[in-house]
Swiss-Prot record:
Keywords associated with the record: DNA-binding, Metal-binding, Nucleus, Repeat, Sensory transduction, Transcription, Transcription regulation, Vision, Zinc, Zinc-finger
Source taxonomy: Eukaryota, Metazoa, Ecdysozoa, Arthropoda, Hexapoda
InterPro entries: Zinc_finger, Znf_C2H2_sf, Znf_C2H2_type
Species the sequence originates in: Drosophila virilis
Protein's name in the database: Protein glass
GO MF term (any one): zinc ion binding
Gene Ontology BP annotations: regulation of DNA-templated transcription; visual perception
Amino acid composition bias (Gly residues), ranges on this chain: 238-250, 568-598
Primary location recorded for the protein, binned into one broad class: nucleus
Function: Transcription factor required for gene expression specific to photoreceptor cells.
Superkingdom per UniProt: Eukaryota
Length: 598
C-alpha cells in the first residue's frame, strides 16, 4: 500500500506538470461496447504524450506478441517500463488479420502499401521512415532530467485510471515536415490540427477551410494535366486502392478522380468531412512553405465494421474566414464543370444586351424635327437679297459681313437686326426695345446708350464703339477702298456700305418707320428718322452745349467753332440760316449762336 500511495502521488505530480504546459486538456466522449455512454469526467485525458492520442482506439483483443497493455492485463495496470517501442507503438499488438488499428489513427502504415501508391498524389504518409524509428520517445535519462530529484520510473503497476487502451496511438515525433502534431486547447470538445511539426499557439490557429478546397482542386488539376489519377485521401483509411495507405477502408472518405472521366464533385464552403485521425498530413493540407492552421467544422470518426466502439468528436460551427495570409494560396470555391446547354441557352447573348440602334422611322422623325425648327426656333438666319448674294460671291465679301455700322454714326445695327420689329429674338435692349440675334450685337448696341467708345484711331484720336468701324476709319487715312459695287463700280471702305448701296440699285427698303410709314434701305437711316419723332438729341457740343439728333450735324457744328475762331462766325451764321430743311435750319441756328458768342 505504501508503494501504491507513492506511485499515485508521483502520477499526480506528473499530471500537474503536464497540465501546466500550453494546451491544457481536452474531453472526448466514447461509446463502449455495452452501449452506455461514458461520462466526461471518466473520459478526461490530460495533455500527456504518454497516453498517445486523445482519440484512442476501440477495444480489441491483443495478439500473443503484445508485451502488455490494458487489454492484455485486464484493465488493471500500465507497466511503463515495458513500453519500449517507437513512441509507445504496440508493434503489432493486434492481430493483423482482424485489421490493424493503426489504419485509423496510426501514422506508420506498412511499407509495402507505400510502394503501391502508383499515380496517386494524395497519400504521403512517409510511414517507412517513421516505422524505422526504433528509439523510445522518453528514455530513462530523459525522465530523470525532466523530473530532477526523482528516481527513474521503475514502479509497480498502477490501477487503471482510464477505460480505454493507449495502444494504437503511434504518435511519432519524427522530423517529417508533413506530419502534423496535436495542439490541445483548454476548451472541451475542441482540437486543433496544425500541418507543421510543432505545436501551434491558439492565437495562430486561424481557420481557412477554403485552403482545403483549393489544395484539393490543385491536386486534381495537376494530376489531370499529367494524364494520371488523383486520389484525395481525407482519412488515409483506404484499403488497397490506388495510392492508398493501409487500413480497412470502411470509414474512409476518399474520392477517386479520373482525369478523363467524370468531373470532380462541387466543393462547398463549409464541408462535413469524415476523417480518421491520421496525423501524417498530405501535401494537399495546407501550404508547404509555412504554417497554415486548418480546422474542419465537423469530424466524424467511423470505426471499422469489426470494432466495438466509436468516437464522435464535434466541433463548434466554423465562421467564414475574412483574411488570407500572404503565404497562402488565394483561391475561390467554384464548380469547374461546364454548365449544361440548357443553362447556356437561357443566358442572353451579348448582342441582346447591347442597346439596339434607333429605327429608321425615329431617326427620320428626329431629322424632321430639327429640319422644321423644333430646336432653336428663336433664331432665323438674316435674309439676303439675291443681288447682294451675287455680289458677295463675286467679290468674296464673307470675311467682312461682321462690319455692321457705318462711320458716320456708331449706332447702326448689323444687317437690319436692330429693328424693333424683329421676330422672336431673345436679346432685347431694355432702353430702346431693340432686339438682336446675338449677345455680342446687343453688347455693341448698348455702347450707343452709354457713350462708350473703346476703339481709338492712332492718327486722329477718333474713337469708335466697334472694332469694325475703327478698321473702316483707318482705311480713310490710307485711302484704301477694297469693296466695290458690281453694278456701278463704286468703291467703299467697309462691307456694310456696299450692302446699303446695293439696296439703292434694287429699290429694297426693308426698314419702315412705325409712325409715318416711311421706309429706308438701312437701319442707321431709320434710327436717325425715329429721333425726329421722339425728339431725342444724343449728340451735344462740348463748347456751347447744343445738342443734335445726328452725329453728322454735330460734326458740322464743330467746324463752325473753328471758323469763328478766325472771325467769320456772323457771316457763316447768316449764310447757314438761309438754307431750307431741317438739317439746314439746325446749321443756321448753330451759326447764329456762334455769332452771338463772338
Amino acid at each position: 500500500m505504501g508503494l501504491l500511495y507513492k506511485g499515485s502521488k508521483l502520477l499526480n505530480i506528473i499530471l500537474d506538470s503536464l497540465e501546466d504546459q500550453e494546451g491544457g486538456a481536452m474531453y472526448i466522449s466514447c461509446d463502449v461496447s455495452n452501449g452506455g455512454p461514458v461520462e466526461p469526467e471518466t473520459g478526461y485525458v490530460p495533455n500527456n504524450p504518454l497516453f498517445g492520442l486523445a482519440l484512442d482506439s476501440p477495444q480489441q483483443e491483443c495478439a500473443a506478441s503484445c508485451v502488455g497493455c490494458l487489454s492484455c492485463q485486464g484493465n488493471t495496470a500500465l507497466p511503463i517500463s515495458s513500453l519500449t517501442s517507437s513512441d509507445f507503438d504496440c508493434g503489432g499488438c493486434f492481430d493483423p488479420t482482424i485489421g490493424v488499428l493503426g489504419s485509423q489513427i496510426n501514422t506508420t502504415p506498412p511499407a509495402s502499401n507505400l510502394s503501391a501508391s502508383g499515380s496517386g498524389v494524395g497519400n504521403h504518409n512517409n510511414g517507412a521512415a517513421l516505422a524505422g524509428n526504433g528509439n523510445s520517445y522518453w528514455s530513462t535519462d530523459e525522465m530523470a532530467s525532466t523530473f530532477p530529484g526523482l528516481p527513474p520510473l521503475d514502479i509497480d503497476p498502477l490501477p487503471s485510471l482510464f477505460p480505454f487502451s493507449p495502444c494504437g496511438a503511434s504518435y511519432n515525433f519524427a522530423s517529417n515536415p508533413h506530419q502534423a502534431s496535436l495542439s490541445y486547447t483548454v476548451h472541451p470538445h475542441q482540437m486543433l490540427i496544425s500541418p507543421n511539426g510543432s505545436q501551434q499557439q491558439q492565437s495562430q490557429s486561424s481557420t481557412h477551410p477554403h485552403q482545403l478546397q483549393s489544395q484539393h482542386m490543385q491536386q486534381a488539376l495537376t494530376q489531370a494535366s499529367h494524364g494520371g489519377n488523383a486520389l484525395h485521401n481525407h482519412n488515409s483509411s483506404g484499403g488497397n486502392g490506388p495510392g492508398g495507405g493501409g487500413g480497412s477502408g470502411s470509414g474512409s472518405a476518399c474520392y477517386y478522380e479520373a482525369a478523363t472521366n467524370a468531373p470532380a464533385p462541387p466543393m462547398y464552403p463549409s464541408m462535413s468531412v469524415n476523417v480518421s485521425m491520421n496525423m501524417t498530413m498530405h501535401h494537399g493540407y495546407g501550404a508547404d512553405g509555412g504554417p497554415v492552421p486548418m480546422q474542419c467544422s465537423q469530424m466524424n470518426w467511423t470505426p471499422p465494421s469489426n470494432s466495438s466502439a466509436a468516437v464522435n468528436v464535434l466541433y463548434p460551427p466554423l465562421l467564414s474566414p475574412t483574411h488570407y495570409p500572404a503565404s497562402a494560396t488565394y483561391s475561390f470555391t467554384a464548380d469547374f464543370r461546364a454548365p449544361p446547354p440548357t443553362a447556356l441557352g437561357a443566358l442572353p447573348s451579348l448582342a441582346d444586351k447591347e442597346s439596339p440602334s434607333p429605327p429608321a422611322s425615329s431617326t427620320a422623325a428626329a431629322l424632321g424635327y430639327y429640319a422644321t425648327g423644333g430646336v432653336g426656333q428663336g433664331y432665323t438666319p438674316p435674309h439676303k437679297s439675291p443681288s447682294y448674294q451675287a455680289a458677295a460671291l463675286s467679290l468674296g465679301l464673307a470675311a467682312f459681313e461682321d462690319e455692321e455700322e457705318s462711320i458716320e454714326d456708331g449706332d447702326a445695327d448689323a444687317d437690319g437686326e436692330g429693328s424693333a420689329g424683329g421676330d422672336m429674338k431673345p436679346n432685347l435692349c431694355r432702353l430702346c426695345g431693340k432686339t438682336y440675334a446675338r449677345p455680342s450685337t446687343l453688347k455693341t448696341h448698348l455702347r450707343t446708350h452709354s457713350g462708350e467708345r473703346p476703339y481709338r484711331c492712332p492718327d486722329c484720336n477718333k474713337s469708335f464703339s466697334q472694332a469694325a468701324n475703327l478698321t473702316a476709319h483707318v482705311r480713310t487715312h490710307t485711302g484704301q477702298k477694297p469693296f466695290r459695287c458690281p453694278i456701278c463700280d463704286r468703291r467703299f471702305s467697309q462691307s456694310s456700305s456696299v450692302t446699303t448701296h446695293m439696296r439703292t440699285h434694287s429699290g429694297e427698303r426693308p426698314y419702315r418707320c412705325s409712325s409715318c410709314k416711311k421706309s429706308f434701305s438701312d437701319s442707321s437711316t431709320l434710327t436717325k428718322h425715329l429721333r425726329i419723332h421722339s425728339g431725342e438729341k444724343p449728340y451735344q457740343c462740348k463748347l456751347c452745349l447744343l445738342r443734335f439728333s445726328q452725329s453728322g450735324n454735330l460734326n458740322r457744328h464743330m467746324r463752325v467753332h473753328g471758323n469763328n475762331a478766325n472771325g467769320s462766325g456772323a457771316g457763316g451764321g447768316s449764310g447757314n440760316g438761309s438754307g431750307n430743311g431741317s438739317g439746314s435750319g439746325a446749321n443756321g441756328s448753330a451759326g447764329a449762336g456762334s455769332g452771338l458768342i463772338t
